[in-house]
Amino acid sequence: MAKNDYVEIMEKNHMEIPWHDYTGNDSEVLIQQAGLIEKASVVGRVGLIMLSCGTGAWRVRTSMNRLSKELGVTCTVDVGLMSIEFNCFDGKECVSQSLSIANTGVNTSKLYRMEQFVDSFPSREAHLTGEEIHKRLDEIEQIHALYSPVKLGLAAALACCGFTFLLGGGPVEMIFAFIAAGVGNLIRMKLIKHHYTLFLNIAVSISAACLTYAVCLHMAELLFHISAVHEAGYICSMLFIIPGFPFITSGIDLAKLDLRSGLERLTYSIIIVLVATMFAWIMALLLKLQPQDFAALHLGNMTHLFLRLIASFCGVFGFSIMFNSSVYMAATAACIGAVANTLRLELVDFTRMPSAAAAFIGALTAGLLASIIKRNHGYPRISLTVPSIVIMVPGLYLYRAIYNFGIMSLTEAVSWFAAAIMIIVSLPLGLIFARILTDRTFRYCT
């Protein structure tokens, strides 16, 4: 093998698919009259773009099925986290393809545009040639990040600042978490932009967030005589790393018995959590930080309720922007999250309801509200529900579980871990039952 060929392979482990080679550039044959290979290329590419947006297997398969029916072919699909295997039949021939993406992520703006493409396909794209359809898909595929790394750093800062208050932190912890999370996610986005590997960007961004928080705390002690009791907020500064989308979509996939996709997404989420919490624990040992309880805020009930609404709105808005939502879509998700998360917290405080049960009700509420809004605005349901309940994911519990495992305080570790697992299971369950109640296509086993 020539040296240049070797370098080219090393530069891109996943080779790009020449989609336009499946069609004749000068062909005027409409896609409905085209051959099976050309039809399969359109169906497969639509599924692959949907998969790259972070949506679950059920939505990917549904989109591919809708296009297949319109093109007069039968399609069977097996979907994973990073790849799709599918077969297309037209009664005479069969085409089998295995497609994969180079990396996984979340892009709700691209997902929204793809859902519009699928919805309009019978009336618009079905009357075009394969080449024209691929050109339109080229345009959609170019929808990358809507925001610069600096803006995404600010979004993470806002989200973690709101998260800090909701977990019991005060103004000092909120300010430090804002700065540290902003720095951490800014570095993370820079690393992602340059295609650094997953483990490296998690380790560096988490370490940077912890270090920034510790520096801010130390400077505040020296300059303003701030008490070291505020060190507890360092946990909140790294909650931007929570893999909310794969966590929730894994539960939805498992509910539809898409076991391959569900287990792969769950594994991916666990990898992120383990790497993040391990490096956070190491940084805590090096910087002598401890996950203490927050100091009491002594707020009145109505004041606390009002501030929880604001903090929940800010937290969900920040996470939604991080998922590449438009500002209006992010604000819509934030309104849902403000209602659902505040309801969850109030149920825990005033009815002594177990946290897991309250999380189920909060997620159910978010799912019902998202279904109502989807009917009126057409936003992808998952683009509203996942950001609105990411703020309910018990990142603090998961970190404390790993921290206590690290110091061999096993009883404490198991207690925190059990509480986290109960809440994590309850969140997708709430969304699933909301979907069952409001979506007849999801309700039945087909």
Which role fits each region the language model picked out?
Residues 233-238, 249-253, 257-273, 335-341, ...:
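C-terminal transmembrane helix-loop-helix hairpin of multi-pass membrane proteins
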Residues 146-249, 321-323, 327, 332:
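Core alpha-helical transmembrane segments of integral membrane proteins
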Residues 1-134, 139-141:
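Soluble N-terminal domains of membrane-associated systems
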Residues 150-154, 174-179, 200-204, 266, ...:
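Hydrophobic alpha-helical transmembrane segments
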